[in-house]
Every structure is written in structure tokens, then in C-alpha cells.
């Protein structure tokens, strides 16, 4: 009987595996759609006007995925402060907020990369499970691509964190250029503090520390002008005060 367990990839078949894990399959499909829409925004093969609509579709699909994942993590919804506090600890809640921040804003390529890459990584993980359910030797070329993605996962997560950080000044620039709303930088700052405090994904916090070390190393060189050094040190102190306390 152990060989016929529904969740077991061996012998169950890909379709049976996906039907057994319906919520995971729904998120997999929405992530694939997010990747598709994001790619058509980054590479506007159908024209610039269509690219803007694909930008919105990608963020809406990501919002759906994030909502499904949040429901999976916290299935029993409660209208209480305790539930909200618990939800704000979840990465899926962070990216639900992220999607809502940018879905109606001016399309920015930098803002689509975290959505695209997170969807790609998570879709790749589930695709490997589907392939295992289909057979251990099925589609070797696709498996090779998925293995390469897995090998470069840390670099991809660092790149995502870099985008998350530099979108903060980008939202301020968009505000002064007339392409953003007054509330967007403040809401995005809240998102960034949530990413900084993330328990499951420390890359944003680690990258902040790495950037601070690099900047301090550069400005402490004798060739660095004094006013630049002071400006950088004041900026570092200001950003450090804004950073949330991490347990």
C-alpha cells in the first residue's frame, strides 16, 4: 500500500499528483502565468501598449498567488490584531502588499523582476515534483534547466533583494517626476521593513549590511573627499535609524 500513496511521486502519475495537491497546482499555474506576463512586459514583443497591460496582469496574478499562499499558511482567517500581526510575518503577505503597491502605478521594469524571479523559482520547484510524478527520467532537458535554476538560487535571491532595496529611492524619484503617488513611498517603506524583518528570507537584511560595509570601506579611503564621507556617514546613520529591530 505504501507504493500507492496519492502524494507519492512514484507511480501516481503527474495528473493524479496535481489533482491530489489542488491548491499547490493552482499556485503553480498562476506562477507560470505571472512568468509569462512578466516576460512579455520585459520583452515587449506585442508592442509597448500591450506591454503595459501585461505588467498589470503579472502583478494581479502574483497577488492571486500570494493570497492563495497566505491562505495555505494561515487557513483560519480571523478579524483580529493577532491574526494581522501573524499575517505580516509571512512572505506571501509581503508580496501581496507589493503587488497592490505597483499594480496601478506607472510601469517600472525594476518592480517586475522580484515578481518574475520569485514566480520562476517557486514554479520550478513544483515543476520538478510534477516531473518526478511523471517519471524519474522524464523530460531531461527541462530537468537540466530546473537544476541550473536551483544551483543559482542564492544569486537570484540576492538580485531580488537588490531590486527591493533600490526600488525605495525609485519610488521617491517617481513621486517627484509625477509618475508616482504621494503615499507610494511610505507604503513601500513599510513593505521594505517587512522584508528586512523576514524570518524565512534574510537576503534583504544581509544585503543592507553588505552595502553598508562596502560604502564604509570606500569612504574611509584617504582619497575620498571629506564632504562625501560625512554625507555617506550621515546617510548610513539615518537609514540605520529607520531599520526595524530584528529579534
From Swiss-Prot:
The protein's predominant localisation is: endoplasmic reticulum
Q: Name one Pfam family in it.
A: TMEM33_Pom33
GO cellular component term of the entry, any: nuclear envelope
Residue ranges of the TM segments:
32-52, 101-121, 156-176
Tell me, which GO biological process terms does this entry list?
innate immune response; positive regulation of IRE1-mediated unfolded protein response; positive regulation of PERK-mediated unfolded protein response; regulation of endoplasmic reticulum tubular network organization; response to endoplasmic reticulum stress
InterPro entries to which the protein is assigned, alphabetical: PER33/POM33_regulator, TMEM33/Pom33
Lumenal topological intervals: 2-31, 122-155
Q: How does it assemble?
A: Interacts with EIF2AK3. Interacts with RTN1, RTN2, RTN3, RTN4 and ARL6IP1. Interacts with RNF5. Interacts with RNF26. Interacts with PKD2.
Q: What's this chain's function?
A: Acts as a regulator of the tubular endoplasmic reticulum (ER) network by modulating intracellular calcium homeostasis. Mechanistically, stimulates PKD2 calcium-dependent activity. Suppresses the RTN3/4-induced formation of the ER tubules. Positively regulates PERK-mediated and IRE1-mediated unfolded protein response signaling. Plays an essential role in VEGF-mediated release of Ca(2+) from ER stores during angiogenesis. Also plays a role in the modulation of innate immune signaling through the cGAS-STING pathway by interacting with RNF26.
Output this protein's name: Transmembrane protein 33
- Species: Mus musculus (Mouse)
Amino acid at each position: 500500500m505504501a507504493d500507492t500513496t496519492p502524494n507519492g511521486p512514484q507511480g501516481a502519475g503527474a495528473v493524479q499528483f496535481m489533482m491530489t495537491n489542488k491548491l499547490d497546482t493552482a499556485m503553480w499555474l498562476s506562477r507560470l502565468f505571472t512568468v509569462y506576463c512578466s516576460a512579455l512586459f520585459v520583452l515587449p514583443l506585442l508592442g509597448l501598449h500591450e506591454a503595459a497591460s501585461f505588467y498589470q496582469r503579472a502583478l494581479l496574478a502574483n497577488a492571486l498567488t500570494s493570497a492563495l499562499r497566505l491562505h495555505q499558511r494561515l487557513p483560519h482567517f480571523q478579524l483580529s490584531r493577532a491574526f494581522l500581526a501573524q499575517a505580516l510575518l509571512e512572505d506571501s503577505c509581503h508580496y501581496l502588499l507589493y503587488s497592490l503597491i505597483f499594480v496601478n502605478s506607472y510601469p517600472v521594469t525594476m518592480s517586475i523582476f522580484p515578481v518574475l524571479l520569485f514566480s520562476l523559482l517557486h514554479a520550478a520547484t513544483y515543476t520538478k515534483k510534477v516531473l518526478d510524478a511523471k517519471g524519474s527520467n522524464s523530460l531531461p532537458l527541462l530537468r537540466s534547466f530546473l537544476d541550473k535554476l536551483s544551483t543559482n538560487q542564492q544569486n537570484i535571491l540576492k538580485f531580488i533583494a537588490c531590486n527591493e532595496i533600490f526600488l525605495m529611492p525609485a519610488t521617491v524619484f517617481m513621486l517627484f517626476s509625477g509618475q508616482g503617488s504621494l503615499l507610494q513611498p511610505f507604503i513601500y517603506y513599510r513593505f521594505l521593513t517587512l522584508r528586512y524583518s523576514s524570518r524565512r528570507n534574510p537576503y534583504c537584511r544581509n544585503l543592507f549590511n553588505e552595502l553598508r560595509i562596502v560604502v564604509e570601506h570606500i569612504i574611509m579611503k584617504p582619497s575620498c573627499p571629506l564632504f562625501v564621507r560625512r554625507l555617506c556617514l550621515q546617510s548610513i546613520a539615518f537609514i540605520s535609524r529607520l531599520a526595524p529591530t530584528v529579534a
